[in-house]
Amino acid sequence: SSNPKSLEAVFGVRCYGSADAAAAARDRAFFFAAEGRNTGRVSSVGDRPTSLCLVKPHAMAAGYAGLVLDQVMGKFHVTALEMFNLDRANATEFYEVYKGVTPEYNAMVEELISSPFLAIEVADPDGGNPVEGLRALCGPADPEIARVLRGGSLRAQFGQDKVKNGVHCTDLPEDGSLECEFFFSILCS
């Protein structure tokens, strides 16, 4: 496609689209349905610990979503996946824990509301808490530091600066389920 914002341009040949609405319903049920219950939540991990990775808008626009997803899927089970386009109120609520803590807070909110981004919920394949492992995959929040200390990390590869650092990931083990619930339960309801 000649459109730089088309799915093919953004995701390359690693993108599948259901043929019609009925096929989309079958595909969604196959990949995400919780057997025996209908909670309205896309994920079906139950009580397993989860963590959140966001492919930030600038990384989406640069066409990195598929590359990030490949690396995430190489280490974790992807239990939910959704595109979001947040308004300021929801972005402010999500990043509230950083207000007054990081000088980049306002710029982080602006980046998150600038255009669509991809939210990825992950679980550890061995059943452990995936937060630390995902943080290691993402690397330090500052891509310059990431390139020195963790050259293969997502932020080293796809980040530009502290705000446009490629990805957001859950910081604390106790926050993984809360961040995932915010996107995949609250915002999806």
Language-model-detected regions and their locations in the chain:
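Non-catalytic terminal and connector segments of soluble metabolic enzymes
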Residues: 1-189
